[in-house]
């Protein structure tokens, strides 16, 4: 009886830890996807490549809203600010992508530099 109780407790704790680890890995993956996407976008020499990179970045940014950093999850104000930062990033990605689609790749790359500013600002707040 005692062995079953201990085994159940270990299983429950393991499940909780695995769940938290899985969420962190997903958020880390989204952030890595954003970084790789930006590098691809900034080095692109055609609209198709730039649009593909920005599209992947947008999807990763939206996915990152599904799981906030652990320290942010505990504070409703911080969580609201985190979501606002992600929304700002998505808005800037959309603005940059609109320039690419309008055939203004050079201007889009200049506008896209704001993505780094948004990243840096939000990393200071939430990392």
Cite the ranges covered by each PLM segment.
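Cleavable N-terminal signal peptides
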Residues: 11-12, 22
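Bacterial N-terminal signal peptides that target proteins for export
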Residues: 1-10
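N-terminal signal peptide c-region/cleavage motif recognized by signal peptidases
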Residues: 17-19
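Enrichment for repetitive, rod-forming helical segments
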Residues: 10-11, 126
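Mature extracytoplasmic or organellar-lumen-exposed domains after removal of signal/transit peptides
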Residues: 24-127
């Amino acid at each position: 009886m005692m062995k079953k109780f201990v085994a159940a407790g270990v299983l429950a704790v393991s499940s909780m830890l695995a769940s938290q680890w899985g969420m962190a890995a997903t958020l880390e993956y989204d952030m890595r996807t954003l970084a790789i996407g930006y590098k691809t976008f900034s080095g692109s020499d055609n609209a198709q490549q730039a649009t593909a990179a920005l599209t992947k970045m947008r999807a990763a940014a939206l996915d990152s809203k599904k799981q906030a950093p652990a320290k942010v999850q505990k504070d409703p104000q911080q969580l609201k600010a985190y979501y606002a930062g992600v929304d700002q990033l998505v808005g800037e990605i959309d603005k940059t992508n609109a320039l690419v689609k309008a055939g203004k790749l050079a201007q889009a790359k200049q506008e896209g530099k704001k993505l780094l500013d948004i990243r840096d600002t939000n990393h200071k707040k939430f990392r």
